[in-house]
Amino acid sequence: MLAIQALGFIAEDPQRLADFFAATGITAEQIRAVAAEPAFLAGVLEHMLGDESLLLAFAANAGIDPAEVARARGVLGT
């Protein structure tokens, strides 16, 4: 699932992870509890869509078109 891949991309870099925590207010402990919830996963993609440099870095790393992130966000709804 693209959202899980995006979360992993964020988590593998301390600065990206710190930015995610600061922007969302979530903690590492809370992520463990909600990681499979569609609303949380939609939020991960929403965070990525709100930061163009993050979005482009993730898309390049994943070998996908950045528009795929928006499409995945739409599929998750909420």
Task: Identify what each model region corresponds to.
Residues M1-T78:
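Metal- and O2-centered redox machinery and metal/ROS homeostasis
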